[in-house]
């Protein structure tokens, strides 16, 4: 997995871990937050490495499905970028764009 993919899934995990099954949540926490290898997770749960990999992949797919429907991560990134724009230069367009993300209207 590339560094970009790891960052992407870590961000998705931060947004959607509460929607995962308990098993997926705990395995993904070990994988992304604690930096456990598949082998270490397999030993922790006393299951095969392949079973861990399958659970992690299902969790990744579930998080991508949630993001495609809810767009929480995309909105967070957009909001962050717009707030950085505000720090550099306060303008009406940036404020309106920030409000539009959440469906608010001036």
Q: Model features per residue range: what roles?
A:
Residues 11-20:
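Short amphipathic alpha-helical boundary/capping segments
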Residues 60-67:
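C-terminal flanking helix
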Residues 81-106:
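Helix-turn-helix/homeodomain-like alpha-helical modules used for DNA recognition
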Residues 27, 41-42, 52:
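Hydrophobic positions on the alpha-helical face of helix-turn-helix-like DNA-binding modules
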Residues 37-39, 45:
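Helix-turn-helix DNA-binding elements, focusing on the entry/boundary residues of the two helices
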Residues 22-34:
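Short amphipathic alpha helix immediately N-terminal
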Residues 48-49:
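Helix-turn-helix DNA-binding motif, specifically the short coil turn and the N-cap/start of the second
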Residues 55-58:
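Residues within the DNA-recognition helix of helix-turn-helix
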């Amino acid at each position: 997995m590339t560094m970009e993919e790891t960052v992407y899934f870590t961000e998705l995990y931060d947004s959607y871990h509460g929607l995962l099954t308990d098993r997926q949540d705990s395995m993904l926490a070990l994988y992304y937050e604690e930096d456990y290898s598949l082998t270490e997770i397999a030993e922790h749960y006393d299951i095969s490495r392949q079973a861990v990999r399958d659970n992690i992949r299902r969790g990744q797919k579930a998080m991508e499905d949630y993001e495609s429907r809810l767009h929480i991560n995309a909105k967070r990134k957009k909001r962050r970028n717009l707030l950085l724009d505000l720090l550099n230069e306060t303008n009406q367009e940036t404020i309106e764009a920030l409000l539009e993300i959440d469906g608010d209207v001036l």
